[in-house]
Regions:
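Short, flexible helix/strand-to-coil boundary loops that buttress conserved ligand/catalytic motifs
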Residues: 69, 78-81
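Conserved catalytic core of Hanks-type protein kinase domains
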Residues: 58-59, 84
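Short S/T/G/P-rich N-terminal loop/turn motif that feeds into the first structured element of a domain
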Residues: 1-53, 60-70, 93-96
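Long, contiguous binding/interaction regions
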Residues: 17, 75-76
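Residue-level marker of structural boundaries
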Residues: 28, 73-74, 83
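Residues that form generic nucleotide/phosphate-binding pockets
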Residues: 22, 80, 84
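Charged phosphate-binding loop/patch that engages nucleotide di/tri-phosphates or the phosphate backbone
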Residues: 87-91
Length: 96
């Protein structure tokens, strides 16, 4: 299984909800076994860094993750989120 984790910070804190709504579009892509978007609780903040939202998804394999990223909804989401975000940090790792 591949675990996919992405951290987002909004360029303007007023846009966090707009970004969250756009990221929720990704839940309609059928290739993920599990998908969720959540607001960071900020309980372990790092000085100089801010994470507003977290995307967490699980995929059966690398092919499923690649299909997810190739889906038209993924491209649509990027077009909506990219102008509103400050940073995006992603990590994928094999589990199990």
């Amino acid at each position: 299984m591949i675990r996919h984790i992405v951290f987002f910070s909004a360029a303007n804190p007023d846009n966090v909800e707009r970004i969250r709504e756009a990221l929720m579009m990704l839940a309609d892509i059928p290739h993920a076994r599990h998908f969720e978007v959540g607001r960071n609780l900020q309980s372990d903040a790092i000085a100089g860094a801010r994470v507003d939202l977290v995307v967490y998804a699980e995929f059966e394999n690398e092919a499923a993750l690649a299909a997810y990223k190739a889906h038209p909804i993924y491209a649509e989401c990027i077009a909506l989120v990219r102008p509103l975000r400050d940073q995006r940090i992603a990590a994928d790792f094999k589990s199990g």
